[in-house]
Amino acid sequence: MGKYFGTDGVRGEANLELTPELAFKLGRFGGYVLSQHETEAPKVFVGRDTRISGEMLESALVAGLLSVGIHVYKLGVLATPAVAYLVETEGASAGVMISASHNPALDNGIKFFGGDGFKLDDEKEAEIEALLDAEEDTLPRPSAEGLGILVDYPEGLRKYEGYLVSTGTPLDGMKVALDTANGAASTSARQIFADLGAQLTVIGETPDGLNINLNVGSTHPEALQEVVKESGSAIGLAFDGDSDRLIAVDENGDIVDGDKIMYIIGKYLSEKGQLAQNTIVTTVMSNLGFHKALNREGINKAVTAVGDRYVVEEMRKSGYNLGGEQSGHVILMDYNTTGDGQLSAVQLTKIMKETGKSLSELAAEVTIYPQKLVNIRVENVMKEKAMEVPAIKAIIEKMEEEMAGNGRILVRPSGTEPLLRVMAEAPTTEEVNYYVDTITDVVRAEIGID
């Protein structure tokens, strides 16, 4: 990670950390770096989610892009993966999404996609950071016909919706409950599943700029669990603020997380001979039960650090076509270059329809070990240093020795928030609580948190 860029672009509290001034510079410098080798006038797509700060940051970012001669196509409110899809399929120089994904409304973020539809690599981010830190802005300042042109492009959303529908199968009145998190999916999910022929119940579809992810969406699926049971839906589908994640709910109201979604899709593709190298790419956060289920089915796995960018890097490097995270990022490389909650949802309902199995039947093949995750809020400067504190390292080693291989512990700094994450898995809930509570007590004592 760099000074400005984390694992998923530039993020911070809007108007305090992620200011309009910084957004302008990111537009100006990012646009320049991503378009300097273009032979024709560069074109950049810009999308945003529903946060109240989105239009403020969009205006500043767009001004920066226009100031270096880039033509900007404003997409409005739509999913992050829609930006990636449109960049790749419409020959744009780059794309930019203004969103902080699953974070609360006070935060926002800016992430870039290259002309290939993939998130930027470390080298490109370093180039942008060097310009941000330069003492003087020496980039060209064209005038008159040299300036960029601003175009509203609502057709982009319709094209994305049509594409996702084309990857699915008719649902013939299947009862589907949607939770669009008062976020980006609120402009598209209803239309996509209506076009597929689903009978819909929708919540989290009334964004007001402040309620994105607020007690709804993939990080708060409790409301959807109740709606699924009350409406008699066959499946519930919860997206996060920018719709790059999916958490599902089965017909009984039980959660089907990213691990189970990856398993269901992976097994389906494997049986059809369509799972590249018969391998799923996952992260260190995936549950032991997921790994055991893959072993039973003879499906291989490749394991990366936490963060969908690392999953994508491994997929591109080795030619895999399915990967993701327990949190609900699922990358289906045959269809898109990044995690796409609505695409995953379309594929999941297609598998249910084609196999004739309920979601609970499909998900029951993975037995999830009890897992507990505690987030300890720390300053960003401390979250990396905490991992080197001798007492913290010692208690982690001690707990791992006690597990004797029947479980696991993971302590890591968040790549996107000022948090230290402590996670444990074990055969029983009592053991999990013991391991996590013991470690968090030591962490809090060592870094001075009561």
Curated annotation (Swiss-Prot):
One Pfam family it belongs to: PGM_PMM_II
Chain positions recorded as Mg(2+) binding sites: S101, D240, D242, D244
EC number: 5.4.2.10
Cofactor, how bound (note): Binds 1 Mg(2+) ion per subunit.
Reaction equation(s) it catalyzes: alpha-D-glucosamine 1-phosphate = D-glucosamine 6-phosphate
Keyword Magnesium among UniProt keywords: yes
Any one GO cellular component localisation term in the record: cytosol
A molecular function (GO) term: magnesium ion binding
Main EC class the enzyme belongs to: isomerase
Modified residues (Phosphoserine): S101
Gene3D superfamilies given in the database record: Alpha-D-Glucose-1,6-Bisphosphate, subunit A, domain 3, Alpha-D-phosphohexomutase, C-terminal domain
Keyword Mitochondrion: no
Alphabetical list of PROSITE patterns matching this protein: PGM_PMM (PS00710)
Modification after translation, per record: Activated by phosphorylation.
Cross-referenced CDD domains: GlmM
UniProt keyword list: Isomerase, Magnesium, Metal-binding, Phosphoprotein
One GO BP: UDP-N-acetylglucosamine biosynthetic process
Function: Catalyzes the conversion of glucosamine-6-phosphate to glucosamine-1-phosphate.
Protein name as catalogued: Phosphoglucosamine mutase
Organism listed in the record: Streptococcus pneumoniae serotype 4 (strain ATCC BAA-334 / TIGR4)
Gene this protein is translated from: glmM
